[in-house]
Regions:
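Active-site-proximal alpha-helix that buttresses catalytic centers in soluble enzyme cores
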Residues: 7-83, 133
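Generic beta-sheet signal
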Residues: 9, 59, 152-163
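Glycine-rich phosphate-binding loop signature in dinucleotide/nucleotide-binding domains
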Residues: 51-57, 143-155
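Acidic, low-complexity terminal tails and accessory targeting/binding regions
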Residues: 2-8, 82-85, 92-105, 149-155, ...
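Active-site catalytic microenvironments for nucleophilic, acid-base chemistry
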Residues: 47, 75-79, 142, 146, ...
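Phosphate-handling substructures
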Residues: 77-138, 224
Length: 225
């Protein structure tokens, strides 16, 4: 695919969160970016702006509705002149441990947690990987279509989301095992993961190649688990 015959969707992770108690904040409200987090997302926004100066056409911006992702989208709005559209489909994964300070000692001394740890392949402590991929796939495909409708060939969209949904999306696209070590995720704070699609995917009224690719690769990943 050439640059002009593709639609790109960039998945940007939010910046560092102010969380001195080291709580699993998940979808809890009220968790803002730290000062360092603000600097992180500013640098990411400046990278998008630099690409725009070199000819990239960013025409659509989506963000998770949580405070940290809205704040992360703000400098992108400022530098690219876009308005972020909140989308529940790119929100953080649901997690049983929300609101807790989780460590090995906490898990060992509280048997009530044990039943949530029996199946890391699903995972049993939160939203399933399958559900995450389905909602993210739909959101990414809609963002790509909107970018194409607004900007035609070569247009680009940005989605500001969270580490696990972004990483699971990448694993699904690449057909890799969904069960993984969280320490091995290649999705740092304020990082950018880019997906590219051929514009031929959007020449029909109801393109479904992306969703089909996602679900096919997901099945491969499940079989390999």
């Amino acid at each position: 695919m050439t640059e002009t015959s593709t639609i790109k969707v960039h998945l940007m992770r939010h910046g560092e969160v102010h969380n001195p108690e080291r709580i699993v904040y998940g979808r809890l409200p009220g968790y803002r970016l730290s000062d360092k987090g603000q600097q992180m997302v500013r640098l990411s926004a400046e990278e998008f702006a630099a690409r725009a100066e070199r000819g990239a056409r960013f025409v659509h911006l989506v963000c998770s509705p949580l405070q940290r992702t809205r704040e992360s989208a703000a400098p992108v709005e400022e530098l690219l002149g876009l308005t972020a559209q909140p989308d529940e489909r790119v929100i953080e994964a649901d997690n049983y441990f929300e609101g807790l300070h989780v460590n090995a000692q906490e898990l060992r001394r509280n048997p009530r947690h044990w039943m949530k740890l029996y199946n890391p392949a699903r995972p049993s402590w939160g939203e399933s990987y399958l559900d995450q991929i389905r909602r993210m796939a739909a959101a990414v495909q809609d963002a790509a279509r909107t970018a194409y409708e607004r900007g035609g060939e070569g247009a680009e969209a940005i989605i500001v989301s969270h580490q696990l949904p972004i990483w699971i999306t990448r694993l699904g696209v690449e057909g890799r095992m969904l069960q993984h070590d969280p320490r091995a995720r290649e999705c740092n704070l304020a990082s950018i993961t880019t997906l590219a699609f051929s514009t031929t995917d959007f020449e029909h009224e109801m393109p479904n190649s992306f969703e089909t690719l996602f679900l096919w690769n997901l099945q491969v990943a499940i079989w390999l688990d």
